Amino acid sequence: MNIHALLVNRFTEALQEMGVENAPVPVSRSARPEFGEYQFNGAMALAKQLKQKPRDIAEKIVETVKLDDIASKLEVAGPGFINVHLNDAWLANQCELSLTDPRLGIAKSPEQNIVVDYSSPNLAKEMHVGHLRTTIIGDAVVKVLEFLGHNVIRQNHMGDWGTQFGMLLAHLSDKLQEEVAETALSDLEDFYREAKVRFDEEEGFADRAREYVVKLQGGDAQCLALWEKFIDVSITHSEEVYDKLNVSLTRKDIMGESAYNDDLANVISDLKTKGLAVEDQGAQVVFIPELADKEGNPAVYIVQKSGGGYLYATTDLAAMRYRSGKLNADRTLILTDARQALHFKQTEIVGRKAGFMKEEQTYEHCPFGMMLGSDGKPFKTRTGGTVKLVELLDEAVERAGKLIAERDNDLSEEELKEVARKVGIGAVKYADLSKNRTTDYMFNWDSMLSFEGNTAPYLQYAYTRVKSLFRKAGVDMATMPVDIKLVEKQEHALAVLLMQFEEVIGMVSREATPHVLCTYLYDVASAFMTFYEACPMLKEGIEPQVRDSRLALSALVAKTLEKGLTLLGIETLEKM
């Protein structure tokens, strides 16, 4: 059920009946409950066109619009706002329909092919905290899009190519004289550090490293076999992180930089043929007048170095062409940090001019801010090094275990381990997902593991509280009677929120903003707590019909929280 879309349709029909065509139909949620749940704000914009006072137009719309089945009251307020108060019986019926629907009343969207490029770690090193945001925001967006019925193609654009691999392969070749690759590469950070020290300090090693680059790029069989072994072990490290994070990426989603190697020369050739790429100081560049500086100098987009080497720009153009052509993507979403915003803006302009995309295909860079430490600087170890993601997640589980052990619970040792895992990982993910992705945020263990406020533990606890309620009532959620009556204001407020789930999911799918879903789930959990205190269910003297109605509403809360958290990639618990 999408109340917003329903109201837009009804107001559009009313305006057409009044002879007003193609007018904007601004419907928004009301700021305060006394103004109803929704508000139509279009009368003021029509005043000039209709040569009438906004309030008179609003009165006419109220007379014309057909909302008797939905609204208990329509009122004109201020200069011409129309406040919509939703009908309790209609709301109750919508809640009943949602409760008996596996999709909770959320309709599927017209199917699109949507490519989502996310995670994309550099395989020369282990995944670190800088990979957290792209991985979990991307995966949440993917899950929402798939839930809405889209054909989503995950693209893990892993950094598996480049000059640094010459240094790494030369070092690996030496290490394999004494140990197997899995042992040699058990700690990629240490391995990278050792190779870098040798490159900087050991006589002759840098030359060997450069030879390996030439061999690798030339397709030398022995060198490629060594490279494949390195990549295989590195991907296994990434898979360990994906498994801990409960994200849906698999090996079949990998489309690394090397996958585009064969097309890079064609990209340059096509850019030259179309008069876009020109030589400048030996390099091939595209000038972009659309992004000129204040002096009118066009932006310079380098696609091939003077020595003939290719750049990220070349690979990203090849990826654009592959996704738009071979994969036939209606939308391409790319999740990287905000520092790459200009690069992707340039890539889109050049790619569209080159005809690598159709006009109707979208290319959406979804930038995100950085994770900061308590000092307000990028999150690091105490010694200033990068924090391995796997170590951060292990610490989260350990901290969660200690916190839960301190609380009153009847959990067995095995249950405690499982609860600690779900709470710890959920806390890290939710702390990130709940922030607007375009802003930086400060990492804080205490706030993210709190059982109060907008946190994963609070939402997981709210879910277990509903499940506990049903255990105490001796009622099976799957077979319970579904007959909802909304009498108290807390019941009404909770029902309105529950019926806004589809609006929220739609917003996340359009804008790639999981924080909107987090805020919604927190609002639902908070409204449930208020409802739970004001509307008792298991007290003596509560009429069976009232009890059953409130339990049904509680069941819809549980299903909404479970579905919402699942879409965010966060697991729920039966008890904690």
From Swiss-Prot:
It comes from the Bacteria. GO terms for molecular function: arginine-tRNA ligase activity; ATP binding. Gene3D superfamilies: Arginyl tRNA synthetase N-terminal domain, HUPs, Isoleucyl-tRNA Synthetase, Domain 1. Its EC number is 6.1.1.19. SMART domains: Arg_tRNA_synt_N, DALR_1. SUPFAM superfamilies: Anticodon-binding domain of a subclass of class I aminoacyl-tRNA synthetases, Arginyl-tRNA synthetase (ArgRS), N-terminal 'additional' domain, Nucleotidylyl transferase. It is found in: Cytoplasm. The keyword Protein biosynthesis applies. GO terms for biological process: arginyl-tRNA aminoacylation. It catalyses: tRNA(Arg) + L-arginine + ATP = L-arginyl-tRNA(Arg) + AMP + diphosphate. A motif ('HIGH' region) lies at residues 121-131. InterPro entries: aa-tRNA-synth_I_CS, Arg-tRNA-ligase, Arg-tRNA-synth_N, Arg-tRNA-synth_N_sf, ArgRS_core, DALR_anticod-bd, Rossmann-like_a/b/a_fold, tRNAsynth_Ia_anticodon-bd. Keywords: Aminoacyl-tRNA synthetase, ATP-binding, Cytoplasm, Ligase, Nucleotide-binding, Protein biosynthesis. GO terms for cellular component: cytoplasm. Signal peptide: none annotated. Pfam families: Arg_tRNA_synt_N (PF03485), DALR_1 (PF05746), tRNA-synt_1d (PF00750). Belongs to the class-I aminoacyl-tRNA synthetase family. Monomer. This is Arginine--tRNA ligase. It comes from Alteromonas mediterranea (strain DSM 17117 / CIP 110805 / LMG 28347 / Deep ecotype). The lineage of its organism: Bacteria, Pseudomonadati, Pseudomonadota, Gammaproteobacteria, Alteromonadales.
